[in-house]
Amino acid sequence: MKYINPYYPWFTSIGNVKYSGSKDGCLAADGWGIVVLDEDTGTHMKMSFDMMITSSYMNEYTAGFYFKSVRDKAVDDVFLYVNNSNYMEIRLANKNVLTTSFKVSQGIWYHVFLDVDTVAGSIIVYVDGKKIGEYKDYVKTGAMAKDFRFYLNSRYYKLKNMIVTDGELSINETIMEVETSIESCEWNEAQDGYSTEDIGKKIVLKPAITKIDGYTITAAGMVWENALGSDNVPSVNISMGQKSKKVRLPSGNSHNAGACFDRVAALENIVVTSAE
């Protein structure tokens, strides 16, 4: 399964985010946690994200994986760290095991890719498609990932375009935002948005997109910054092509909602239907 989120501002108010629980493939700040756990493939984990440091001084964790114990013995967690000289490190259980050749510069967005294989015992880090470090002495435990964390409360850097998977992910894969038009739904002036209190009302997104600037689509997600359920319409059914999910709309102060679909080849036939 592939889990994605492109939208940094969702994370600005909640500090360190550790994901657990199982909801859907969107990474969101309102507690929609996920488990990156598949009994067949959870031993080989990959994540990618874009990072920009906003200060000349770092000494910060950025992201990494937690693993299940094996035969009642703890397995070292794997994290990426940028030290006070701005070099990226691989850390196991809070200890530096490899300082990479890569030095981060302020004000530049970098595409970071982390590959952890507990069967092969390898940890590989790429930045902008280039391998910058490989640790080959990670214990071959065969442990499965139980969850992961992005450190998002730092004053010193920003993260966006986060992808986590226990399946296929290439080092040049990233998230791109696209605009769509909306059909089959009326604008509510009083609500300043598209809204309904009736079951079965639809929002249809157009057009179909199969390639974006030469990139092939492998997964897709749709998110709202301001979605709110009601007593009459607590949920929506979201369909994309042949796939669909029922998503419960948030209430109260939490207005983020969305759904993600792995293994899709196009953005097409996207319909949001109000549901009970």
PLM features per residue range, with description:
Residues 15-33, 86-87, 190-198, 245:
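Short carbohydrate-recognition loop motifs
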Residues 47-49, 108-117, 123-125:
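Short tryptophan-centered beta-strand motifs in secreted/extracellular beta-sheet-rich domains
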